[in-house]
């Protein structure tokens, strides 16, 4: 039996019993870029690994022919297989035929971003997301645990850094809050 609980579950004190009952292995998100790079940039083998994983699930060359389309899906997933498969599924529903085009992906990405935006705004998580995107580490704040639970941030393999979901970076309120945060830091 293989279970994949949210990473935030592993950090809760009441979850300490999980390790004593089950053999737990954490499956981190695949690193697609360096922390200082933009969210649509790639560095290292992560992009190719995600594409290979996707090719094991679908007829990749028939369904998603364009490299730009594949790159957008992979970048928008943030390196999380679950996110990638969900975006591909939603893009396939939007597709007019057998092939998923960039416009289908953008439609699926737009819907996902709107759900994220509503969730972030309804719960007041924007400032914690800005902090997490800057520091690349989690905090003990309950908002941070909620952000992890809702997959608005990921833990990446390698150095063990955290970062926000790349689609969060495209949300207007986040962009505005980052600008305000940078202004406040530079004037301090």
What are these regions (language model features)?
Residues 1-67:
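The catalytic "switch" region of P-loop NTPases
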């Amino acid at each position: 039996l293989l279970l994949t609980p949210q990473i935030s579950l592993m950090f809760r004190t009441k979850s300490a019993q999980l390790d004593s009952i089950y053999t737990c292995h954490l499956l981190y998100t695949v690193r697609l870029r360096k922390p200082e790079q933009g969210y649509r940039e790639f560095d290292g083998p992560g992009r190719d690994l995600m594409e290979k994983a996707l090719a094991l699930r679908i007829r990749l060359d028939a369904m998603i022919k364009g490299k730009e389309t594949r790159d957008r899906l992979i970048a928008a997933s943030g390196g999380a297989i679950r996110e990638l498969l969900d975006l591909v599924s939603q893009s396939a529903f939007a597709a007019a035929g057998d092939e998923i085009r960039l416009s289908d992906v953008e439609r699926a990405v737009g819907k996902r971003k709107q759900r994220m935006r509503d969730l972030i705004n309804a719960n007041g998580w924007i400032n914690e997301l800005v902090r997490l995107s800057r520091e690349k580490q989690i905090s003990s704040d309950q908002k941070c645990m909620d952000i992890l639970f809702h997959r608005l941030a990921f833990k990446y393999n390698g150095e063990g850094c955290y970062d926000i979901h790349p689609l969060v970076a495209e949300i207007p309120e986040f962009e505005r809050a980052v600008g305000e945060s940078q202004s406040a830091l530079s004037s301090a």
